[in-house]
Structure formats: structure tokens, C-alpha cells
Regions:
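P-loop/Walker-type NTP enzyme "switch/lid" segment
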Residues: 8, 35-96, 103
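Walker A/P-loop phosphate-binding motif and the immediately C-terminal alpha-helix
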Residues: 2-40
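Short amphipathic alpha-helical segments and helix-helix/interface helices
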Residues: 23, 82, 86-89, 110-113
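Conserved small/polar residues in nucleotide/adenosyl-binding loops
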Residues: 117-118
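Short, function-defining helix-loop hinge/capping sites that tune catalysis or transport
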Residues: 19, 45-47, 108
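N-terminal regions of ATP-driven nucleic-acid and macromolecular assemblies
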Residues: 2-3, 52, 56-58, 111-114
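Conserved ATPase-coupling elements of RecA-like P-loop NTPase cores
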Residues: 101, 105-112
Length: 118
């Protein structure tokens, strides 16, 4: 399994669209792709797949609006979200994991890097 993190410090530059397009390309090549929508305050990856989702080769792990009421996310909340993603990854066993990140540097980025160590 290979992991690819799509990151930019600025919002609105196409991270989500780029992630979705990479996922579609990899799926067309026969790869199973798992996407983590790590922009958990304003997730939008599911909207990228309206109409053709669920795709048989692409799975999206999104927080929906579960964190929308929080201005600041505690590390433990982020850790819990990522642990759930890991469980799904182990059950699906994808060829690629794509991670669509939020802009700037947040607890999400810190926990993503820490989870890579584990």
C-alpha cells in the first residue's frame, strides 16, 4: 500500500479536486483507492463523487458534519477519527491511500504525521 498526502497551506487551490482526480485515475488502472478526507471541519470529498459514488474501486472516509460545531479540534478527537480510518483501511486493503488535507497547519496535520510513525 502506498500513501499520498495532498497538501497546500492555502485553501481553495484544488486539493480536493486533485485528490479525486488522482483517485479516479488510479481506479481506472485497476487499483483500489481509499481516500481520507482529513479536512474534517469542512469535508467536501463526498461531493466530488456525487453521481458515481460509491465507486467499486474508491472508498471515501469523511467526517461529514460531525466536527462542524468545533472551532478547534483537540488532538484526541483527530486521533479517534484517524484510528477509525485505519480500521477501514485494514478491512479494505487498498493499493493506495490518498489523504486530502485542510489548509494551513492544524492538529490534523500533526496527528497524520504521528500516525505515519505508528
Amino acid at each position: 500500500m502506498k500513501a499520498i498526502i495532498i497538501y497546500s497551506g492555502k485553501g481553495g487551490v484544488g486539493k480536493t479536486t486533485t485528490t479525486a482526480n488522482i483517485a479516479r485515475l488510479l481506479a481506472k488502472q485497476g487499483n483500489k483507492v481509499f481516500i481520507i478526507d482529513a479536512d474534517i471541519n469542512t469535508p467536501s470529498m463526498n461531493t466530488e463523487f456525487e453521481g458515481d459514488h460509491p465507486h467499486e474501486m474508491i472508498w471515501v472516509h469523511s467526517s461529514g458534519n460531525m466536527f462542524s460545531k468545533f472551532i478547534y479540534l483537540e488532538k484526541s478527537m483527530v486521533r479517534q477519527y484517524l484510528e477509525l480510518a485505519k480500521k477501514k483501511i485494514h478491512s479494505i486493503n487498498p493499493d493506495y491511500v490518498l489523504i486530502d488535507t485542510p489548509p494551513s497547519v492544524t492538529n490534523v496535520h500533526i496527528e497524520l504525521l504521528r500516525s505515519e510513525e505508528r
